[in-house]
Structures are given as C-alpha cells and as structure tokens.
Amino acid sequence: MPKKNSPLLPKETTTTQSSVDTSGSSNLTWPVSEHTIRRPLWARLLGQILDPWLDLSIEPEHSVQYNDGRPIIYVLEDYGLCNTLILDKACRKTKLPSPLIPLSGNPLQRKRAYLALSRRSSSNSLIPNQRGGKTHSDSLANLLQAHRIRDTLDVHLVPVSIFIGRTPDRQSGWFAVLFSENWALVGRFRRILAILLNGRNTIVCFAPPISVRQTLNEGLPPERTLRKLQRVLRTHFRRIRETVIGPDLSTRRLLVDNVLATEAVREAIGAQAKRDGTDLSETWRKAQAYAWEIAADYSSPVIRSADFLFSHVWNRIYAGVLVHHVDSFKEISPGHEIVYVPSHRSHMDYLLLSYCLYKCSIGLPHIVAGINLNLPVVGTLLRKCGAFFIRRSIKGNMLYSVVLSEYVAQLVAGGYSLEYFIEGGRSRTGRLLQPKGGMIMMTVQAFLRQPRRPVLFQPIYIGYEKLMEGTSYLDELSGEPKKKESIWRVFWNIPKVLKQKYGQVVVNFGEPIALNDVLAELAPEWEGQALNENEKPAWLSSTVNHLARQIQTRINSAADVNPINLLALALLSTPKHAMGEADLIAQITLCKKILLELPYSNRVTITPHTPERIIAHAEQINILTRVHHPLGDVLRVDGDNAVLLSYFRNNVLHLFTASAWVACCFKNNRRMSRIALIRLGVGMYPFLQAELFLPWTEDQFAQHIQQVIELFVREGLLLSAGNEEEDPLTRNTSQTDEVFRLRAISHSLQQAFERYYITISILVKNGPGTLSASELESLCQLAAQRLSLLYASTAPEFFDKGLFRGFIQKLRELNLVWPDTYSKLLFDERLDTSAKDAQVILGRELRHTIERISPEATKPAPK
C-alpha cells in the first residue's frame, strides 16, 4: 500500500496520455472568476452538509499541470452525487476549476465540466429480461463530435479516482470496515454510509491530462476512437484501483463471462442444445445460471469484518487456535499456485482455516463448498469469504461438469489459491475417508492446459478436542438419515454453540506436494508441453489416484495428539470405559513415551501437558466423570461420550499401528519369535496401509516393528531371550500392570482385525463364485452389527460399510479375490492361509462367534 503522500501514478504514460501540448489554440476558456458564474445553489448547500464528514488526501499534491488556462473536463469512474461533491471539494482545495461550471460553448451539451464512464445501475434483478445500460458514455461521444466539428477545440480529459475508506485501521469498527472501498459498484445509500463512517479517510487521485485532439488525430473511425478512449480510461482506473486497494478478487464478476466464453463451454452448450432440442440462447442461459450458482463473490471488506467478528467468537468458544509449521510453508509458497487440502472433520474447518491464513498474513483461497451450505444469508457470507458451491453429484449433467471444470481452470490460470476437501464430506468416524479425485483431476487438467505456474498441494491437519456436530454424528452413525441444513437450524443452534467450551484447536501444515515432482515420477513422458482441453493422457487417472492417497498420507503425517486423543486411547480399551486414576496416568504416560521415542514424522505435534493436567482438562470440558471411592477415584466416560471418544481415538489411530500390532500378537499368545511377529505384520500391512494411510514401505514397517519391540522390552512389557530373529519374546503370565497396559495398547487395532476376519469368514463360508463385492459388503455389515450385539458393545463405526469396502478392494488389488464373468468373487487356498494367520491375533471364542454368525447368501427359491 503506498504511503499517504506518495505519488500513485507512473511517470510514463501511453500515447493517448500525452504530456501537455502548448501548441495550437482554443476558443474555450474558463471563467476568470467564480464570481462570474457561481456553483449551483444545491451544490453549495449539499457541500456544506458534506464538508464536516470529509477529510481529503489529494494526489498529486501539486496541480500546476492542470491549472495552465487550457480547458479540462474531469472523468470519473462512475456517476454519483457524492462523487461529484467530493470532486468539487477537491478542486476548490487545489484551486482547480469547478466541475459544476460548464465550459463556454458547452461541448458536453450538459451544464457541467465532468463526465463518467458508467452510471450506477438502476436495474432490478427481480425483473427478468430487463435491458442493461448503454455500452458507452453519451457525454464522451458528444465531446468527440464537438472536436470533429470545431478544428480549434482541444479539451484535455483529467481522470479522477475517488476512494472512500480504502484502508481502515485495525482499530476501526467492523461496521466501518464493511463500508470501506472495494471493487464493487455500490448504490447511493451504501455510498452515503461509507462517507459517514470512512469519509475522513478519502483519497482523490488526479491523473495526467489526456488530449482529446491528439486522440482524434490518430485517424481512427469515430466508433473505434470512442471505444479506444474508453478502454484507455478504464485501464487507467483499474490500474489506480489496484494500486490503492489491491487486485480485484471478486471472481464472480470477472470469471463468469470468461468461463462462458471458453471453447469447451461453447461446445458443451451446442451439444446440450442438440440433445435437448432447444435453441442455443436458452441453453446458454442455463450454462450462465450454473456459472452464477458456482461462482464465489470475494469481498475484502466482508473478510475484514469476519476477522473482527470471529476473533471474538473463537476466544469465547475455544481455548486457543494453534498453528504449526506455517513458516516453512510461507518460505516455499511464493511463485506457486497453492491448493490447500485439509482434513474435513467439521463445518468449522472452512472458517478456522481461513481465519488462520488471514492471521498469518496469507491470502485467502477460493474454497470449494457443498451446495447444501448455500443457505440464505449464510451462503452469501460464505461466497463473500471466497467459497464457491458445487453439487454433490454431477454425473449425467455434462454441461454442469464442463462449466465447473472451466471455472476451476480459470482460477488456476489466474493464480488464485484453492481449498477443497478431497474426502468429499465430513468424517463421521474420525478417520480420514477414502479420497475422491474429482477436484484433483480438474486441478491437474487445468495445470496441464496452461503449465505456467507450478502447483503446490498443501496438506493440512485440523484437530479438535470437542466437536460441535458430535450429537448429529452419533445419530447418523446409528442409522438416522442426515438432517438437511437450514438457515433456521443455524440460527437456532448459535446460542447453544456460544454457551459451550470446545477446548483447543490445532492446525498443522503438512509436508507440501509439488505437482511437477509427482508428474516427473509417474508421467516421465510428459515434458512440460501444454495439452489440449479434451486431451486425457493414459497416465492421468493413475496419477490423480496416487496424488490423492499421498495427500491423505501427508495429512496423517502432520497429526496433532491432544489430551482427548490420549484419554480416548486409554479409556476405550476397557470394557466399561473406566480406569483407576493411577492406571489412567500410567497408560497416558506410556502412550506419550511411544510417540516421543518412536516418532511417526517430524510434523506430528504432541500435547506438552502432564497426564494429571490432561485429566483435569477433560473434567473441565465435561468429557470425563470422576467417581470418588475409598480405594481410589475412578475416572470414566458415560453413554454417548464414550461413543464420541472413539472419534478422537480414530484421529490418531495410525500413530500407534506398529505398537498396537505387536501388542495384539501377545494378547492371546504368551510367546512368539521376532521373525514370526515381523512376518505376520508385513503380511497384514497392505490392509492397514490402505485403511489408515500409512507412509512406510513394507521394509520400513518391519523396521518400525523392531523398534517397538525394543521399546516394549525396555519398558518391561515384553521379555526377550536374545536379539536373534528366532529368539522368543514373552509376556508375563499373571495379571500384572505390564500385561494390562499391553492389552490396552492392542485394543486400538483389535476391531480392524475383527472386520478382516468377518470378511474372510463370510467368503469362505459361502464359497467362490457366490457373492459379488456389494453383496459381500452388505453381509459383512450385518455380521458386524450382530457381533456388536452379542459379543461386546462397539462404536457404530465398527460396522461402517466403507471400511469393509476398502478391505475388499485391497483384496482385489492383491489378487486374493477376483471377479468372474458374472461379477462374483473367486478365491483360492491363499485366503485360507490368511484366515489361519488371524488365529494368532483373535481369541478362540471370538473366532468361533464370528464363524457361527457369518451369514450365507440367500439362495433363490426353486421353481
């Protein structure tokens, strides 16, 4: 932002913005004195009313080049009474001729000496088919015509830019910020409010004069001369506005027309019109409606207003918002097209991440949001904060798909940063969901079409201690349909939200992913050349899938371990979700030791609080209940809180994969060799990696298991007879504290192995060629629900269909199962081997229960 007294205009000008030419003469002169022709009475009266509210900063300070006796006409960006009065005051302050006193001869054919390129629109958006305003200024056309008629006439145009409240201080009220200057063309009432609130911070910029005569002497046809002069003036106003208030980010106004003008959209409109049997104009309006439905309406004043508002909200409901690893991101991000890809746990993700970026002085991205959030008032505010809305499903709607793709392409080509959630929706279980590659595909294709600016994907982990949507997640996991968002529900829940305390929020920036590096690895045949709009290389889909999984893996590698995560890991390992205080402290201590001594990655952050402080914090936010007892206090979680805690356990489940695997192997076995433990772990790893987005190769996972073994031996959880591969590892036989802690660690992965065994058991029981993948999913879900009822109460996510789907998909990728010509799954004896391996982990009673309840497919009744 330029300093208040610095010149805003470049020293050099275009050929039409010529320096002052003293040659020639003009028969137009200004009145010698304002006493000869006075300003209109209405202007004097209104000026006196407005003067106390205005404090003008005029640039440049010296007006010698304007006040040399030659006739000048001022050019404003748009008409408006307030603008006219401000210009008049600026002219009086600098002793320039008044814009309200016409030139002799009246070349404008109006009683004034100023004109505007455009007028404020008076159209009503509620009235369809209303004609818009003129495409050019009548006054400017009249002025050019007067110069053609009178050869001696040489009026100079002086463009004048007016900014009211361009940069309100941070100490200014948020209401004043809302009415500060931006790129939008505002109405009269809003302009008056802007003057009342920000008029004392008004800037008036006079530009160098433009000779109309020299423009005419270029010899262009009249219509082209008019268009060129208007184009020069518009370019000037835009350049000055960018200098004063920053670039125009109101993409809705700038990008919609560009989207509709692309070749791909025009072709899609033609194809859609042909399919529907409609005319092109009707289909074009349909495409335009799609573009307006999608497009953001970025507003800097609204962003600044939201900062004032949400600073108070966050301080009220959160105990702080911490941001980690942002400095390293700021070092490498310049010069890149940034795509923020955060985890998606809550509706608050949209607001929190934008708030953090704003506070870190990082430009806000354009955020992809589901159309379900386009509610009255809320949707408008989200659009103003940079959100653009897309439909949940676009299959079968080719026109919409093309418009959306081109909109994203325009953003990428324009250098706008993006933000989207590749999980497609909020996680109801606390795990990262399997990624959807649609938005990544659009981003990659947009880059391949115009590979000018390198793309950087920035994974971000957002961690909560308490969720606003916790109750609704419980209902949905229990089988109730998702409630449709409504503005009334939003307003109804605001008082409830403001009364709650939601603990601390942590935002961790993961390791960025450079798209060029991914393409160099997976698509070496691409050499940086631009691809056509409809060109889809064979490697594109596999590259997008790899990129999506890598993003999820990097998000998990930047996890934050907060107090509630540690409590959930400990308490949910017991049948009644309760522990004595001393046992709970010991278990939390062990979990922290595993994380600190066997670091998952250098971007994982861990709460610095002691176990005692963690327990006190959980009691403060009403997650933990203390039951006093003469033999020692018992700490527990009750009812729905226990199910909700599974959400926070799942947030960090992946961090304990290796340690939980080792502990699981000793839950039902007292003795096992190192080599057997590692061999079984490596065999199970592909399924765990697919479900939990783990970063290691199989060899790296084997090394990690070895490190866990050494730690468990040091902690006394396991006993080692030696360091050779064949040397046995043993655990204690009695119910010691070490055995208790080992079993508690194992519990976090127990349910995953139970799901795997359910799937294999149902396949084996039904035989090859009997079940399709979808039929197997449904039977697995039913069996898991029944097991939960009969054997032990579990969280609803235990029978989540998506988890079974992921396991079945991995079986297919490893060729352990494959479809026949009728899409029925086939398998061989290798599946029996996998079932035998499960005997090492699962107890006999549990295996027997699973085998007994595993359902068979319903066979059709004989005819």
UniProtKB/Swiss-Prot annotation:
The HXXXXD motif is essential for acyltransferase activity and may constitute the binding site for the phosphate moiety of the glycerol-3-phosphate. It comes from the Bacteria. Its main location: membrane. It catalyses: sn-glycerol 3-phosphate + an acyl-CoA = a 1-acyl-sn-glycero-3-phosphate + CoA. GO terms for cellular component: plasma membrane. The gene is plsB. The keyword Acyltransferase applies. It is a peripheral membrane protein. This is Glycerol-3-phosphate acyltransferase. It comes from Xylella fastidiosa (strain Temecula1 / ATCC 700964). Belongs to the GPAT/DAPAT family.
